[in-house]
Amino acid sequence: MRRSAITLESEISDTERNALFAVMKNLSLKGTHLEIGTAAGGTLCEIYNFYKSSDREIPNFWVVDPMQYFPDQLDIVKKNLISNGVNLASVRFLESLSSIAIKKAFIENPVFDFILIDGSHKRKYVTQDLIWTRFLKKGGILCAHDYSSRFPGVQKSIDLFLKKYKNYKLISVTESLIVIRKMDTTKSSEITNMMMITAAVDGFIHQIRSSINKRVSTKNSHT
């Protein structure tokens, strides 16, 4: 059982959340908030409580998660939200992989003020998650957790995204939370097919290298 399933706490540290809220308090983010990867719903609860404690309008939320992180995840998430005063009617759950859930977005064309990516650490999936930025409004906030050298799939995906899309501005990096603002609309859609192919190939190569290194390490330990 994952620790967050027991504690129901956010997997984002207090320091990271405080840095995020320091940015958010100076912005008017009244539109829908998207969370990709929710664990036990702890971070959503923290964001909700931030708005409530600062007497701000509480936005609606979308949660994208296959709900397979730990047993009974969806039920645990809902109970956690309710215990924190969150009205479940304001939360839309898309219980599927990000790559599947986004098909609904292409049909409905939503607009998000805030996107938090905290799902798979593999480069292929982080790149897929970044497709959701097509629906992030000008002036909106994009965050990604586990942005560090410990998770090269996350770090490389975000770095390449910022390098390609100059209309996104790096605001802060605190521990492993990166905060980015969309300063202008994107002339062409975020994340091209070539970027997806490159991410998949790069991830495959990384997996092979990791497997080889692990085997070599195991072999050396027995010699």
Q: Where in the sequence are the language-model features?
A:
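S-adenosylmethionine/decaboxylated-SAM
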Residues: 2-7, 11, 17-223
